[in-house]
Amino acid sequence: MQKNEPLRFLNPKSCAEIAKKFGTPCFVYSEEGIRASAGETLKFPNAFGLTVRYAMKASPNATILKIFDSMGLHIDASSGYEVHRALKAGIKPEKICLSSQELPEDFAVLYQKGVKINACSLDQLKRLARAFPGQSVGLRFNPGMGSGGTGKTNVGGPSSSFGIWHQKIPEVKEILKKSKMTAQRVHTHIGSGSDPKVWQRVAHMSLDLVQQFPKITTLNLGGGYKVGRMASELSTNLQTVALPIKAAFENLATNTGRRIHLEIEPGTFLLANNASLLCRVQDLTDTGEEGHTFIKLNTGMTEVLRPSLYAAQHPIVIVNQANITKNYIVVGHCCESGDLLTPDYGNAEKLLPRNLNKTEIGDLCVIEGVGAYCASMSCKNYNSFPEVAEVLLPVTGETRIIRRRQTLEQIIQNEV
C-alpha cells in the first residue's frame, strides 16, 4: 500500500490560483528548483574541466532551454528536430551536440553551422566521413553493458542498438584513416535511472576507449542519474558517484599526459522533481466490495505515460482539507485500460492502491515528479485530447504561461 505524500513546491492556495488562471490540467515548473538542480550538476567533480549538457528530450520547452543556457549548460539533442528547436530558442550551434538514432537529412548543414555530431553507428560514421573528410567527429560507443530503472530505459549492452559496439574499434579506425577524420570525442550512455556502481564501471571502460584514439580530448559519460520521485526512492549523490571517476581521469593524465575534458548530460536529474501536474478529480466509481474504488482524473497517459509504459511511480496528492484517507486506484481519462497512474512496482498491468485524502468530484489533484519525460513523452492527442498548458513559477514575479493549451483546431489543422 502506497502512503499519502506531500506537495513539493505548490500549496493549496497556489493550486487554486493556478487552476483558476490557467485551467486544468497543466504542468507547473519551479524555476527555483530547476536552477538549484542545475547548480548541483555544475558542481560535478572533475579533473580537467566540465561541460554539463541538458538532455533536452526530457522537456524541450524553449523557456526551460533558456534557463539552462543562462546558467552555462550546453545541449544534448537526440534528433535533428531537437537541434532546430534549440536553435530557435536562441541556443548557439556550438553549444549543441547531436547523438541520434537517425542522422537527419540536413546533418551537413547543421555540422557546417557548428553543431557537434556524434556518430552513433558505423554507417553514420561513413556518411559523416564522406561529407567531411579531414574534419573532426564524435564517437558514441555501446560499451557492452547498460543499466536502467527498467529494461525499457537500459540503452547499453548486447540488447541495445544505441552506439557503435565496443568491439568494432578496428572498423572505426579504418574509416577514420581512409577519410583522414579525427575522433575528438567519445560518448557513452547506459540508461536512465542507472545503478551508480554500473555507471562507475562503464566510466572506467569509457576511459579505456579514449586510450584507443590519441586525438580524443573529451569524454561524455552520459546521464541517467537516478532520481527518487517517491519518498521511499533514493536519488544518486553526484559527489559520491563522481569522485572516483575524477581520480581515474587524474590517473590517466599521470600515466599518459592526456588531460581529458569531462561532459555529462543529465535530463531527469535536472527536471524530474521540479514540475507538478495540476489536474482535477472528474469522476469516482467502484467495483463493489471485492473490487476497488477508482479516481478518474481529467488527465492521464496523454500527459504522464511513464506509469503505463514503465510501471513508474509518481506521488499523487489530493488537494483538499480532508482529515481522513481512503484507498484508491487512480486512472486517467483515456479510453484505454492501460491508462493507469497507480500501477504496482515493476508491473504496469497490476493495480496498486494508494492511500489518499478522501476525495470528491471536483477536487484538485497534483501528480508530482513530472518534470522529465512527461510533457515531452506522452500519448499526444490520443482520443483527441489537446496538449495541455505549461506554466512557470518564476523565482520572482507572477506565474506565467510557457506553452498555451492546444485547441481542437490546432489538432486537425494539417488534415486534408
Per-region residue spans from a language model:
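Charged (often Lys/Glu-rich) extended helix/loop segments that serve as interaction or gating elements
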Residues: 259-416
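Active-site-proximal loop/turn and secondary-structure-junction residues that shape catalytic pockets
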Residues: 58-60, 81, 102-104, 121-123, ...
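Generic beta-strand/beta-sheet core signal
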Residues: 55, 99, 120, 140, ...
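A charged N-terminal "starter" segment
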Residues: 1-135, 173-182, 211, 353-355, ...
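Structural preference for beta-strand elements that scaffold enzyme active sites
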Residues: 49-53, 72-74, 93-97, 114-116, ...
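Conserved active-site and cofactor/substrate-binding residues in soluble primary-metabolism enzymes
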Residues: 10-13, 29-36, 59, 123, ...
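Active-site loop/helix belt of alpha/beta enzymes
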Residues: 131, 143-285, 385
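Conserved, mostly hydrophobic/aromatic
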Residues: 34, 57, 79, 110, ...
